[in-house]
């Protein structure tokens, strides 16, 4: 489906409503949590970003993405490149997201995620104080 935009749209029209309904049910059981996270490589592409307070882009250099995805999925570089080509560019993703994390190595990413967690918890505390 990555090479066929029409087939991808038909598939997304089936999958995305079910995924969002499942996420809504999951969130109902976590209403007291400080915040919840929804992971999606195609959040903006699918037009799902409107239902979220904050968006976070996670990007990495193309060569590293290719290497990681080929290894993870046992896929060829050509197949992975087709997937990436079917998605929004990193430049547009970063432009649209509220925050951006760069995933080059685990230690730096973990530190950046911890900082983002701290910010989200402070924001939650500030919202609670005004309620």
What are these regions (language model features)?
Residues 1, 12, 69-70, 113:
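Short, flexible helix/strand-to-coil boundary loops that buttress conserved ligand/catalytic motifs
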Residues 1-35:
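ATP-dependent small-molecule kinase phosphotransfer cores
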Residues 2, 6, 60, 74, ...:
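Residues in soluble alpha-helical coiled-coils and helical-bundle/repeat scaffolds
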Residues 3, 43-44, 108:
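Glycine-/small-residue-rich active-site loops that bind phosphorylated ligands and cofactors
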Residues 7-10, 39, 54, 82, ...:
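Residue-level recognition of specific faces of alpha-helices
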Residues 11, 55-56, 65, 80, ...:
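Hydrophobic packing within well-folded, soluble alpha/beta domains
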Residues 17-25, 50-51, 71-126, 131:
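Small-molecule kinase domains that catalyze NTP-dependent phosphoryl transfer to phosphate-bearing small molecules
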Residues 21-29, 35-71:
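ATP-dependent NMP and nucleoside kinases share a basic, alpha-helical "lid"
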């Amino acid at each position: 489906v990555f090479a066929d935009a029409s087939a991808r749209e038909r598939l997304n029209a089936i999958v995305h409503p079910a995924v969002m309904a499942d996420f809504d049910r999951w969130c109902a059981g976590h209403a007291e949590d400080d915040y919840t996270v929804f992971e999606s490589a195609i959040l903006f592409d699918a037009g799902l970003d409107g239902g979220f307070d904050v968006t976070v882009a996670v990007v990495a250099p193309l060569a590293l993405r290719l290497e990681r995805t080929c290894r993870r999925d046992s896929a060829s570089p050509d197949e992975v490149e087709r997937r990436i080509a079917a998605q929004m560019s990193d430049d547009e993703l970063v432009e649209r997201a509220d925050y951006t994390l760069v995933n080059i190595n685990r230690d730096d990413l973990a530190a950046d995620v911890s900082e983002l967690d701290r910010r989200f918890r402070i924001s939650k505390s500030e919202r609670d104080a005004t309620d």
